[in-house]
Amino acid sequence: MWQEYYFLNVFFPLLKVCCLTINSHVVILLPWECYHLIWKILPYIGTTVGSMEEYNTSSTDFTFMGLFNRKETSGLIFAIISIIFFTALMANGVMIFLIQTDLRLHTPMYFLLSHLSLIDMMYISTIVPKMLVNYLLDQRTISFVGCTAQHFLYLTLVGAEFFLLGLMAYDRYVAICNPLRYPVLMSRRVCWMIIAGSWFGGSLDGFLLTPITMSFPFCNSREINHFFCEAPAVLKLACADTALYETVMYVCCVLMLLIPFSVVLASYARILTTVQCMSSVEGRKKAFATCSSHMTVVSLFYGAAMYTYMLPHSYHKPAQDKVLSVFYTILTPMLNPLIYSLRNKDVTGALKRALGRFKGPQRVSGGVF
């Protein structure tokens, strides 16, 4: 029975999540087992969804009409996306490594940032490698089960990031506006609840929307006018009425997008109000610069996603959809570590210490988190 397989081979190993423990303090969770869990469940999702293919045509492969359909610019686009992809992996990987190994970064803020980096690495790896491989092999196809898996992972990871960004803004609000209560309001237990809630919310979105999206009967044309299996692009191939499902998707997006984004806006509004009361002009300028850069990235991420998922698909234009999707699926995972972390003096200091560690061990006093 698959239930027994799930408990013995999936749930039990999930309990043994790898943690770094220093001075009896759990510093950072590395939820690779969560990703492993998703991959183990996917065959069952694929089997369930695959049984619905009897309503479709005899061909079970989809064809992407992606970013490389113009030969004169495809080579340049391939090079740019490759650079962005490997930069995102490197920057996020460096962030996770530094937060793990440097005791000065063992704080709630960097704990949450490490999970943002991990989600970004998984997120971009769900979409970009398939694009690059298809270009190198001169093919544009993806199987039905592969499209289902990509759609599920994408929704799960992007949903988790939506929630996490909102809660990270709340963390900054507490740190700046209520510094005396910060150790209580952002305790280790609260941080674990934030991470668990983000992953749960993202997984719920994936489990709810993926089977419905892939269960529609598709017309003879299986050409997805996109570079990955995004719901609005896939729904355009459906031969059935999708109005009810679009309503369900709209409700989900209100919960997944507008609520976290409202938390972000409210948190930064309170932060800016508090910053205006600072006596230091230099401090105000630095705070405004930091908040503006954060809000730019967050607005880009949420805004593009809102346009994609909260408008009826009859209003969508394929060219615009692909450009907007590039912003929040490819660019954002690269920008997040650069904006949130690598410009920070604490992180640059940790990087210098890591590079100079070969000179000899350094004794460092850690934080209380």
From Swiss-Prot:
Q: Where are the transmembrane segments?
A: 77-97, 108-128, 149-169, 192-212, 248-268, 287-307, 322-342
* Disulfide bond annotation, renumbered to this chain: C147-C239
Entry's localization field: Cell membrane
Question: Which PROSITE patterns does the entry link to?
Answer: G_PROTEIN_RECEP_F1_1, G_PROTEIN_RECEP_F1_2
Q: Which GO terms describe its biological process?
A: detection of chemical stimulus involved in sensory perception of smell
Q: Which GO terms describe its molecular function?
A: G protein-coupled receptor activity; olfactory receptor activity
Please give the superkingdom of this protein's source. Eukaryota
* Extracellular topology ranges: 1-76, 129-148, 213-247, 308-321
Q: Name one GO cellular component term.
A: plasma membrane
Cited InterPro entries: GPCR_Rhodpsn, GPCR_Rhodpsn_7TM, Olfact_rcpt
Listed A to Z, the keywords are:
Cell membrane, Disulfide bond, G-protein coupled receptor, Glycoprotein, Membrane, Olfaction, Receptor, Sensory transduction, Transducer, Transmembrane, Transmembrane helix
Q: Which residues are glycosylated?
A: N56
The function of this protein is: Odorant receptor.
Q: What is this protein called?
A: Olfactory receptor 2T1
Q: Which organism is it from?
A: Homo sapiens (Human)
Give the gene symbol.
OR2T1
